[in-house]
Amino acid sequence: MKYSFLYLLSELAVCIILLGCSTPSKSQGMQKGFVQIFDGKTLKGWEGDSTYWRVENGSLVGEITPATLLKRNQFIIWRGGLTKDFELTLEFKITKEGNSGINYRSEELKDLQYALKGYQADIDGANRYTGQNYEERARTTLAYRGQKTVIKEQSAPGPLQDHIKSNAWTETTVTGSLGSSDSLKTLIKSEDWNKVHLIVKGNRMLHYINDVLMSDVTDNDKINGKSSGLLGVQVHVGPPKKVQIRNIRLRQY
């Protein structure tokens, strides 16, 4: 019994060390060091097309009307600099027809105004995609809601389309489950305020909605993956829609 007890203690200690060193903790986001990057009154520090973006009742609002339908996705971009390792918290509300997302470690396209290419924490009004990791204008879906995935290392650059099938990156290994997509969907409120918490450190990206982990990606693809880039919020092409974002706070490491 003494040997078993000591053995269990040693195993527990190893687990605690591993968790502390290698797994970003959601609770870290509640610590000090967060900076508010949207003042709730103006678009100071942000840049986008005023046809689609405005401030209303303390929220950053992206809206498409019947008179302003889009031909391509549009972003409002945070001009506070590039982000590398960080945590981001915010709240969102989106109409049922809505399609949006929070882009990070993204690249601004030179030939298209207010267009970003990069990782995205997906948001949509039907909650079909909310919480997943989607790479805009690049490798497409890296993890569906409920998945823990590892993106395989690539040996050489090549056409991305060679590794995309059904709008998902095929060079991906699912290494674990965070719960079924349908069960996690029940935790996301429709047309009401939901909380987003992103933890991005090294090649690990965790997407939380309402304090529940929705997707977990480890990106070992050094050719196509990005270690830093821009932050932005998307309005997606499609029917009229509205997304509201508030209480945007960033903590950089």
Place the predicted regions along the sequence by residue:
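Bacterial N-terminal signal peptides that target proteins for export
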Residues: 1-12
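Carbohydrate-interacting regions of secretory-pathway proteins
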Residues: 23-253
